[in-house]
Amino acid sequence: MQLKTALLFATPCDDEEDDMATLCCHSDQGQMFLLTRYPDEDTVDLTLDDEPSTLDGLKVTLWADRLLIEVAAGDSDALRGDDFLEILHSTPAGDLAEVELTLRNILQGTGVFVSEV
């Protein structure tokens, strides 16, 4: 599955939401992607449009223009039958550090994060 978006929106620690880390985007086709985690939880919430899933064991790889989210085969229903979601993005280079920090916060202890930025 693939989405194209102009920007990845990242919040590494939202004080107003009990320190929840959030990464989200809206595709050029109007689809919404949301990846969140509260610091005291052992799982990650992934929402695609209006379909939420609770997952662990995600692998996420970030490039300057691409984000790849890989799920276990048993969790492919979260991505409508696919085992990965590729998001092509045009996030400004100056904002990628915040995206990286957010992904580290989301995946720490629950998954794998690889930065190729």
Which sequence ranges carry the predicted segments?
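Hydrophobic transmembrane signal anchors and adjacent membrane-proximal interface regions, especially
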Residues: 3-8, 44-46, 67, 85, ...
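Short, low-complexity, polar/charged sequence segments that are solvent-exposed and flexible
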Residues: 41-44, 54-55, 65, 87-91, ...
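A short, structured beta-strand/loop element
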Residues: 57, 61-77
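Residues that cap or initiate secondary-structure elements
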Residues: 28-29, 52, 75-77, 93-95
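Mixed-charge, glycine-accented linear interaction segment located at domain edges/termini
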Residues: 81-117
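The feature represents the first ordered module of a protein
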Residues: 1-63
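Residue-level signal for well-ordered alpha-helical segments
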Residues: 2, 46-48, 76, 80, ...
